[in-house]
Amino acid sequence: GLGDVYKRQEYLLDAPQSVHTGQKLHVNSAAGYWSAFRAVLHTAYRDRKIKENPNGFLDRIESIPTMREHLSQEELIRLAETPCEEEVLKRAFLFGCLTGLRKSDIKQLTWQQIQPYTNGKMFVTTRMQKTKQIVHNPISDEAYRLLGERHDGLIFDGFKDKMLQGPLKRWLLAAGITKKITFHC
C-alpha cells in the first residue's frame, strides 16, 4: 500500500552512499531516484497495472542547487601539459573543455561530423543527444588537433565512463588541481 511507498522515500533519504564510505546518499541522488520511482508508478497506473495513481499523495524530494567548479585558463593549460594514463580521456576531456560539447555527444563523435567552413576553419555538427537539436559549433585549431588522425568509426574510440573516476582524478591531481571537476554530461 501507500505506507510501503513512503518507506521507500524514507529509505532513500537515509540510504548509505556505498557500503564502503558509510556516508548518506546525497539528497540530489535521492531526489533523482525518487523521481524515477514515481515515473514507474505513473507508468503502472497508465498501463492499468495499479488502480490508483499514488503520485498525487506523494511529496517530491526537493533537490539542492549545486555549484559546479570550473577550470581556469591557467589550469586548463597545466592539465594539457600533464601526462594522463588514458590518452583518449585526455583528448576527449580537453576537447570537451574547448568546445562545450557534452560527454554523451563526444562519445558518439565521428569524422563525418567534422566539416570545413568556407574560410578553412572547421566546425562540428552534432545532434545533441539530450535535446535532439542539430547544432553547428566552430572548433578552434587546438580542439581540431585533439581529434587525431582521420579514420572510420568513433573519433574517441575507447573513451569509457569508468575513466572519469580514477584516471580523471589522478590526472587532475598530477596537474595540481584539487577542485571537484566533472565531465559535462
PLM feature spans:
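Amphipathic, well-packed alpha-helical segments that form the structural scaffold of globular domains
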Residues: 9-17, 38, 42, 59, ...
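Short helix/loop segment immediately N-terminal to the Walker
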Residues: 16-25, 178-181
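Active-site/catalytic core of tyrosine-dependent DNA strand-transfer enzymes
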Residues: 138-179
